[in-house]
């Protein structure tokens, strides 16, 4: 029997909407499958023939690509296949360091296979899928879709109304906006029912909501974020919301003011911005933090964004540590205790 190394059992998978490029190191084999259950089953059959008794030791390495990689994750969970879900930034840096020019998807799959060397032991595991958490994710995805539709309809209504446009169009848009708002509320009610039906989710939700300034929707949005990215650290969570600073430097003389990246979904920032405004009025610690930033010369928006970051990192800590908010918790989070 062959003595397989970690690199030999690392299967690289470059995921796209309709297909997945696969690199199988044992025979330096490039392989393409459909991004379907049938495609995965064909791959498994091939891998079992190639690896025989070593099949159970295989590790699938891939970059999470939103909804496109969800089926792969669920399949691996069901079939007890170990995976290493590689952060795209780490993957890019590894490819650059290894001299890859990313000429094709097959090259990308090979790079992903080699990236197994980056994995810590705790990062290689069989995915755990929570049916309840998946329901919340799907409902939140639908909620974001409905909100986007409502915003588009509202903007269109404004453009028609300002020029005293067609009454039928105005009336239809007003009805559509009312319907979409009702649907948003219905989705929130459904999500809350799911949360209330699960003891752990309910506790996590209440711990997040214990921060003065974070309301029902804010707690749902953050709970969804923490469920979606269970292994993210505080810095990564801030980036996923799109509140990480982006600096602009050109040469030695041009330095623009840093801005937030806005890389995450707008709904997170929109909901949490309202929460930050409430917190600066009714949360003593957040108000003090905000006032101190203002006194030090920060603009109002900059100070509000800083409050948002602070609220998110504290909420993340409360969720992870299963604690409720208090002045002591805030001071510990700020290194004051």
Question: Locations of the language-model features?
Answer:
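Gly/Thr-rich phosphate-binding beta-strand-loop-beta motif of the actin/hexokinase/Hsp70
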Residues: 2-25, 112
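Acidic, metal-coordinating catalytic cores used for nucleic-acid/nucleotide bond scission
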Residues: 61-71
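Short, solvent-exposed helix-loop connector elements
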Residues: 124-138, 161, 165, 256-259, ...
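Nucleic-acid-processing active sites and adjacent nucleic-acid-binding tracks
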Residues: 27-59
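Long, charge-rich intrinsically disordered scaffolds of nucleic-acid metabolism proteins
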Residues: 84-207
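Phosphate-backbone recognition surface of nucleic-acid-processing proteins
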Residues: 210, 216, 222-296, 300, ...
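Low-complexity, acidic/Ser/Thr- and charged residue-rich accessory regions of DNA metabolism proteins
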Residues: 252-253, 290-337
């Amino acid at each position: 029997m062959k003595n397989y190394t970690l690199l030999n059992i690392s299967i690289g998978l470059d995921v796209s909407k309709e297909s997945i490029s696969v690199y199988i190191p044992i025979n330096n084999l490039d392989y393409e499958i459909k991004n379907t259950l049938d495609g995965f089953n064909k791959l498994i059959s091939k891998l079992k023939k190639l690896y025989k008794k070593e099949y159970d030791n295989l590790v699938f390495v891939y970059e999470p690509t939103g909804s496109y990689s969800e089926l792969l994750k669920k399949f691996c969970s069901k079939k007890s296949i170990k995976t290493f879900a590689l952060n795209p930034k780490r993957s890019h840096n590894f490819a650059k360091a290894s001299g890859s020019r990313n000429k094709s998807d097959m090259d990308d799959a090979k790079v992903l296979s080699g990236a197994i060397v980056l994995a810590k032991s705790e990062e290689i595991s069989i995915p755990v899928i929570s049916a309840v958490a998946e329901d919340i994710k799907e409902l939140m995805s639908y909620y974001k879709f409905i909100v986007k539709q409502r915003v588009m309809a509202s903007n269109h209504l404004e453009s028609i109304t300002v020029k005293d446009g067609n009454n039928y169009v105005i009336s239809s848009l007003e009805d559509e906006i009312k319907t979409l708002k009702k649907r948003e509320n219905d989705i929130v009610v459904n999500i809350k029912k799911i949360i209330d039906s699960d003891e752990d989710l309910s506790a996590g939700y209440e711990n997040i909501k214990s921060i003065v300034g974070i309301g029902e929707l804010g707690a749902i949005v953050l709970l969804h974020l923490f469920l979606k990215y269970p292994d993210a650290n505080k810095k990564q969570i801030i980036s996923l919301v799109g509140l990480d600073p982006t600096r602009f430097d050109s040469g030695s003389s041009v330095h623009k003011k840093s801005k937030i990246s806005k890389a995450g979904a707008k709904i997170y920032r929109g909901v949490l911005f309202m929460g930050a405004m409430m917190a600066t009025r009714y949360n003593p610690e957040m108000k003090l933090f905000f006032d101190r930033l203002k006194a030090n010369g920060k603009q109002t928006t900059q100070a509000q964004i800083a409050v948002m970051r602070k609220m998110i990192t504290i909420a993340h800590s409360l969720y992870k540590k299963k604690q409720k908010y208090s002045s002591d918790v805030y001071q510990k989070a700020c290194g004051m205790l």
